[in-house]
Swiss-Prot record:
Transmembrane segments: 286-306
Oligomeric form and interacting partners: The 4 large subunits of the cytochrome b6-f complex are cytochrome b6, subunit IV (17 kDa polypeptide, petD), cytochrome f and the Rieske protein, while the 4 small subunits are PetG, PetL, PetM and PetN. The complex functions as a dimer.
Binding site for heme: 36, 56, 59-60
Family: Belongs to the cytochrome f family.
Chain's role: Component of the cytochrome b6-f complex, which mediates electron transfer between photosystem II (PSII) and photosystem I (PSI), cyclic electron flow around PSI, and state transitions.
Native organism: Chloranthus spicatus (Chulantree)
GO molecular function, one term: iron ion binding
Name of this protein: Cytochrome f
Bilayer disposition of the protein: Single-pass membrane protein
Coiled-coil ranges per UniProt: none
GO process terms (BP): photosynthesis
UniProt gene name: petA
Length: 320
């Protein structure tokens, strides 16, 4: 009887362990699949190199345009829009991780001046929220609140991304001054060609690792190819693995050179970076400017009135 109870207890514990393991696996797998923009953040403390190059270009190799629109000047403690535009042909389809074709996604990285940050939800107007859509922005690092990232998100819906930005107040932040500041932006459309660990994705061209003769091409059951090349120097076999996605350009018996493309380049996306300038304007300076302009207008009005008065006096003297 005691042995039976022991067996039941062991069976129950094993069932619980397996259930917990499955739950952990599902949660972990979901987190990883949804968190790949984080990988770039983990690799670089600062996303902008000393040369000015944004590190996203290390994975997205093709060069494409990106644009940003910000106000020329903003007042302290004010919420404004930074609009990042990532243009591309909406008819294009990209190679997905499973080798099939699908719509392009987009992403953006916005590097603001120190002190500028994402506006809190209670400061964002309903009109701006409508322009933002259902986007969820995040800081590049908890300590770098002036650097914001977003993506991947559907490109057909978010080829223009509206960032709600809160300007700093020099009255409360002593390290912020009323100056002109640069803003940097990077934007990509489509998947990258290189993963953060340096390995290739299936969204790039694959080249021959040796010169020789293509002796065998095997189409793999789950997609992709296994290409065997007989080395031209000593005849030893070199096997190149091609994932599902790129189209094969070579055939068996063909003579190829070192680094010759074995596949087409399926990439239709790319990365671009740009910048803009924004002035953190002193309200007193604005008031002074308005007072100066008002004084000029009043002076012009008085000048016109004085001129008309002089003309009347002159006309009356002539009549006299």
């Amino acid at each position: 009887m005691q042995n039976r109870n022991t067996f039941s207890w062991v069976k129950e514990q094993m069932t619980r362990s397996i259930s917990v393991s499955i739950i952990i696996y599902v949660i972990t797998r979901t987190s990883i699949s949804n968190a790949y923009p984080i990988f770039a953040q983990q690799g670089y403390e600062n996303p902008r190199e000393a040369t000015g190059r944004i590190v996203c270009a290390n994975c997205h190799l093709a060069n494409k345009p990106v644009d940003i629109e910000v106000p020329q000047a903003v007042l302290p403690d004010t919420v404004f829009e930074a609009v990042v535009k990532i243009p591309y042909d909406m008819q294009l389809k990209q190679v997905l991780a499973n080798g099939k074709k699908g719509a392009l996604n987009v992403g953006a990285l916005l590097i603001l001046p120190e002190g500028f940050e994402l506006a809190p939800p209670d400061r964002i107007s309903p009109e701006m929220k409508e322009k933002m859509g259902n986007l969820s922005f995040q800081s590049y690092r908890p300590t770098k609140r002036n650097i914001l990232v977003i993506g991947p998100v559907p490109g057909q819906k978010y080829s223009e991304i509206v960032f709600p930005i809160l300007s700093p107040d020099p009255a409360t932040k002593k390290d912020v001054h009323f100056l002109k500041y640069p803003i940097y932006v990077g934007g990509n459309r489509g998947r990258g060609q290189i993963y953060p660990d340096g390995s290739k994705s299936n969204n790039t061209v694959y080249n021959a690792r040796t010169a020789g003769i293509v002796s065998r091409i095997v189409r793999k059951e789950k997609g992709g190819y296994e290409i065997t090349i007989a080395d031209a120097s000593d005849g030893h076999q070199v096997v190149d693995i091609i994932p599902s996605g790129p189209e094969l350009l070579v055939s068996e018996g063909e003579s190829i050179k070192l680094d010759q493309p074995l596949t087409s380049n399926p990439n239709v996306g790319g990365f671009g970076q740009g910048g803009a300038e924004i002035v953190l304007q002193d309200p007193l300076r604005v008031q002074g400017l308005l007072f100066f302009l008002a004084s000029i207008i009043l002076a012009q009005i008085f000048l016109v009135l004085k001129k008309k008065q002089f003309e009347k006096v002159q006309l009356s003297e002539m009549n006299f």
